[in-house]
Amino acid sequence: MNGYEAYMKELAQQMRAELTDNGFTSLETSDDVNQYMQNIDNDDTTFVVINSTCGCAAGLARPAAVAVAEQNEVKPDHKVTVFAGQDKEATQTMRDYIQQVPSSPSYALFKGQHLVHFIPREHIEGRDINDIAMDLKDAFDDNCQ
């Protein structure tokens, strides 16, 4: 591993911890993603954060995801994350389940293996964090019972 890769791995670990320290399960391999998705109960909801090292992930996506997942009255059954640019195979496998244009950071909400809501980067970047949180709240309220 060269110096740049080592630096990015260390930096990404802190960014990953912002989610895992708040109850998100990190899926770091393609097998992790497939095992999770293939074994999820059809009635369970899963909130997926596709994490990223960019500024909008740090200042908007991760804080909004954590706040709403912890504070909203209606919560998904499960919270998972993959890290774009770091866990490339895991991210691609999750994107195969999502079946939307690749976007990071982004959010996906599943019921079983069925995608019920998706928020791409362009609906995160440049927006007020409270607006993003309200989008997540509405998605949880509509789909997580």
From Swiss-Prot:
InterPro entries: BrxB/BrxA. It comes from the Bacteria. It holds the Pfam family Disulph_isomer. One of its GO terms (biological process) is cell redox homeostasis. NCBIfam families: YphP_YqiW. Belongs to the bacilliredoxin family. This is Bacilliredoxin SERP1006. It comes from Staphylococcus epidermidis (strain ATCC 35984 / DSM 28319 / BCRC 17069 / CCUG 31568 / BM 3577 / RP62A).
